[in-house]
Amino acid sequence: MEREKSNILSRRLESIIFMFLIGLISVLLNFTFSQNSFAEYKATLSASVNEDTAAIDGTEVIESSSETTEHAINLKVKTTNKTGYTATLSTKTDETALLNTNPAITTKISSISSVSSLSNLPANTWGYSFNTNADFNPIPALSAPANLIHTTEKSISEENHTIKLGLKLNSSLKPGNYENKLIISVVSNPYTPKAVMTEGPDFNSKLESLETTTDKIEHFKKSTVAPTASMNAMNIEDEDSDYEIKLWLDPADKTAYYYVETEKVYLNEDSSQMFLSGFDGQKIENILELDLSNFDTSKVTDMGGMFRDMRNLTTLNLSSFDTSQVTDMGGMFADMRNLTTLDISSFDTSQVTNTALMFADIYNLTALDLSNFNTSKVTDMSYMFSNMSNLTTLDLSNFNTSKVTSMSAMFTLSYYDELDDKLETIYVNNDFNTTNLTYLYGMFGNRKKLRGGAGSFLTDPSTADKTWLRIDDPANGRPGYFTRKP
């Protein structure tokens, strides 16, 4: 009797085929773009699936021991779009069930309602999984597509992804074809073309090359008009820039101009040594004015030596600088000998690891606000304030030195500047954390006017060891060169 029942069931279901009509890949280039004369940004996006229609024999599924099956669809995507792409999945309409093509038959294969493993799918339901995810998700409707993948950069090579359709069936289904259509949409992410500056050392080399024995640069700023051919402008954009950036010198007003079609210029990740005048002091040492207001520094990681040796600049406005990604500020302002005003109170230094020589040899600076400095990741503070002879006080109350390994010559003064020394007080909130401090040679060399909060000092300050990096408390046998901030 059981065999006869099985034969009847087999005949009834032999014509049940489940059709999955996979919709055409929707390939859309969705990025903003304005025409320019340099290099039109052309993003490409290709996407394909290995089949347009997935057919599954329902009889085989029902007669299997698990009454389940999986069907894999391979999705291939590649894009040159710099912000990547987004792939979504949905049905063509808000109907998520597989419906019998005979409208008189009302049985259907419904979407699962919650995440489930294949073996735990309810009878006569289906779902999908993506790539390595073992569990199956409810089939998404047109009004609420599922986000399969979202990338943020261009493809290095063709990407391969797998969409699996999982079903669980039983004999209660009526014979016939059950269908639905899935839409896989692959869309490039929005992208706005950008002007990106060349690397700092290359910019510096090109800026220096503008000068001659008679024509010197005294100003640097953006031009509102493009250069003419007679100006012999040179290109200073990065190879990944979507716009051309031109640089030239106008000898009449002694100004180095740059021009770009966009309002903003993104500085290179490596913006080190951009305005370095050179250790020989022969190039771009006469600059008196820098207009950096159109520079976006949000992607910069290296500002080491960025303004080093700019000996004639007296003020520097960096209020527009975003330093949230910067790790290297070593020697950033070193040897700016005539600088009298430096406002870096807006700096975010939370990622900085190197501040060595950052303010070294700024002889004429009388005040330095470091109240917002976050030094929690800094490892090298050597020579950080060396030869700053005109500071009378230094407020380091916000300093965290727990990771610092080197403070060699951190506050030192050269023998030649000893008579000009004015530093008397260093304010802190707590003793310096010297747990990881290894290099500390000559930290306070020649700082003979410096006193701790209770008057402690050494006849030869260069002999101070790391125990002097604390709040002065001689009454308890703890002399130090620091004063507790009021």
Model-derived regions, located:
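N-terminal secretory signal peptides that target proteins for export/translocation
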Residues: 1-13
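Sec-dependent N-terminal signal peptides
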Residues: 11-27
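Short, surface-exposed loop and linker segments with low hydrophobicity and enrichment for Pro/Ser/Thr
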Residues: 17, 73-84, 155-158, 244-254, ...
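Generic detector of N-terminal low-structure segments
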Residues: 20, 33-35, 413, 484
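C-terminal segment of classical bacterial N-terminal signal peptides
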Residues: 24-36
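Signature of Gram-negative chaperone-usher
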Residues: 36-192
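Negatively charged
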Residues: 191-486
